[in-house]
Amino acid sequence: MTIDELQKIVYNAGIVGAGGAGFPTHRKFSDKVEQIVVNAAECEPLMMVDHHLLEFHLAEIVEALNILCDTMNAKEVLIGIKGKNMHLLDEKVVRSLKGTRVKIKEIPDVYPAGDEVVLTYETTGKIIPEGAIPVMVGVMVINVETVFNIYKALKNASPVTEKYITIGGDIPEDITVVAPIGMKIKDLLTSVGYGNLDGKEVVNGGPMMGKLVDIENDTVTKTTKGLLIFPTTHGIIQRMKQPVNVSMKRASAACCNCTMCTDMCPRYLLGYNLEVHKTVRAASHGEVLNTESFLQNALCCGCGVCSVIACQQGLFPSKLSMEIKGALGKYGLRRENNVQPESVREVRASRLVSSNKLIDRLGIGKYVKPSVKKIDTVFNPDTIYIELKQHVGKPATATVKAGDKVKCGDVVALTAYEDLGTVMHASVNGTVKQVTDRFVIIGK
């Protein structure tokens, strides 16, 4: 198989990054890739999707990785997994990997171990240059579920029509489900018995980097990995609800210029010239001509360590940094003085944030269950809303119209292959009820 053939298979299957922003996976394949790094870190607390896939589908994942390795002529595959999760791996499969290109690489139980810059360093020892992507150092980083989707596309020509999701938080039993893409999140939670949300809010994603769910309108997408339920009064919810202008006002009133937000920043500790305290200072004091203090936020990964762990004043620097980063992207502003760090900072090892410390600081220890059950419920929603923008790049354009009959797996929208985007498929059998500028709506 050639790289071009692999790219077209993965594009046609609608595969995007399942654990992050949804970057179209076919665009990552390159003959410049020397090492494939699999993100099995399960970076944020309470998330369990990767656990289940590694426990029950490791053989399939390894098979797909070998195909990727052969196609790109990569030298090795490194599956980055925390030591505490090694017991999940099938011993027979692990033994079969000895002497092969696929290696299990133990990484520390710290946050954010799943950030691609951190993960690349922990697995390969390489530091990705500022403002660059992993392939610049010969690395491709890929999520566990994404690899599993590639396996299904290669073996069965199966497109992405469903999503593995952990449902957890302030509920009696955490579960992992496989839900059709486009199902209303409200309907999904109701179907598994967690539809009563009086006095509670739902987070799409982890407790650090997730977003609040609009429970009446939000749907399952290709990047939905976790739905966490917390009381409305919980600190996680209050942090996510705080408007960025309030964060700026609080910073101007309460920031003590201690620099702890910079000192604890995972990217700074890897040698990046990202000094969060300078952004807080410039924004709160209106230093609009201090351009570097704003442009440097292009290097921020939004992990939230500065907000949750570092700041002793209860400020949220990461909220400000990500707001600025979004504005930089919107207006096409780039930081031109990016450099290649020569080494990590000497203090890095002493400033890593353990998962246990993070759980304690977030106040979610009581929500950590001893096990998470995978349930095999087959969901049968009356209506599906296939969002046209579930990925990085251009939105997909509908290829169907109201009244068209579709089957699960049929193409309903796509972004042209030459553009950055992907293909959308029906996740149920039914009839197209409506096509809007945001959704293809399918009903029975």
Region locations from a protein language model:
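Ferredoxin-type iron-sulfur electron-transfer modules in oxidoreductases and energy-metabolism complexes
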Residues: 230-252, 262, 267-344, 381
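Extended boundary segments
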Residues: 126-129, 143, 335-378, 440-441
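Short hydrophobic beta/alpha edge segments that flank linear recognition/processing sites
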Residues: 407-421, 439-441
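Short histidine-centered loop motifs in beta-beta connectors
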Residues: 396-405, 409
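Hydrophobic alpha-helical positions that pack around
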Residues: 75-187, 191-198, 206-207, 231
